[in-house]
Amino acid sequence: MDTTFKAAAVQAEPVWMDAAATADKTVTLVAKAAAAGAQLVAFPELWIPGYPGFMLTHNQTETLPFIIKYRKQAIAADGPEIEKIRCAAQEHNIALSFGYSERAGRTLYMSQMLIDADGITKIRRRKLKPTRFERELFGEGDGSDLQVAQTSVGRVGALNCAENLQSLNKFALAAEGEQIHISAWPFTLGSPVLVGDSIGAINQVYAAETGTFVLMSTQVVGPTGIAAFEIEDRYNPNQYLGGGYARIYGPDMQLKSKSLSPTEEGIVYAEIDLSMLEAAKYSLDPTGHYSRPDVFSVSINRQRQPAVSEVIDSNGDEDPRAACEPDEGDREVVISTAIGVLPRYCGHS
């Protein structure tokens, strides 16, 4: 495998609370990145159907109409929006990662998916712990969501937003041999920790600590976002415009890409040379020769944690309550075909 390739990070505005339209925009941006020669492109946290910014601007009672609308736009991990994006990856021969609001049963999750250049899903994960007000809207992931996968460009891992601050998250992915890290964020507004320069520093440190290239992607809030969140008459809308801060950093903490203005939509690119990781790991390998397992050890429970575990009646008798079971849409179903399967709608059975 070639050790050099071109990577891309998206800074763009989703079609707020419209999953189908945002999936279409994703396909357009994937084609644009591929045409520019990129072999891997990263999209922001909750890119589909957009980050729920109304949680920042409205009180709990006022958010309810927005929440109902938002929940209706959450998508399934094997839904048509996902298949459309997988087909785009295959058509343009480009690996990609994107965040989405996943509906599983009646619960939403802050999920990410990594699809390789052949259209095969390599990672399907959920944010381990939603941050602050996000917990009102989204459920939690578990240890099975700390994943690194071998792709056409190298070993890739992904985390959402403040997950990139959690030291043990970083350690877990580094221990799996992560080479390229997808750092997906919302827009850089609403809190001191979400200031662009602060997030940039977080990702620079991630790159140095783990010896990886970091692709940082963010959303942008434009006039359509202001209208979607209905904040024109409540606040000075100018304070919420922008929020873009897409960057690509090397393991030496240096900026490898150009940068865009906070209000600008676009894609930033960088030439990645994985041979740089040899120097990085020579200098500092926190999960290898620079570790002290005799002093510190990390234990990770990677077992999935379903809300309900069923023990089937061993005598095989039919349960008369079966007719009263909820519909499939009312329970979380483990989708065994989500990983490692070619897109259904791209000429494959």
Swiss-Prot record:
Subunit note: Homodimer.
Catalytically driven reaction(s): a nitrile + 2 H2O = a carboxylate + NH4(+)
Example of a GO biological process term: response to herbicide
Transferase among keywords: no
Native species: Klebsiella pneumoniae subsp. ozaenae
An annotated Gene Ontology molecular function: nitrilase activity
Keyword Hydrolase (UniProt): yes
Protein's name in the database: Nitrilase, bromoxynil-specific
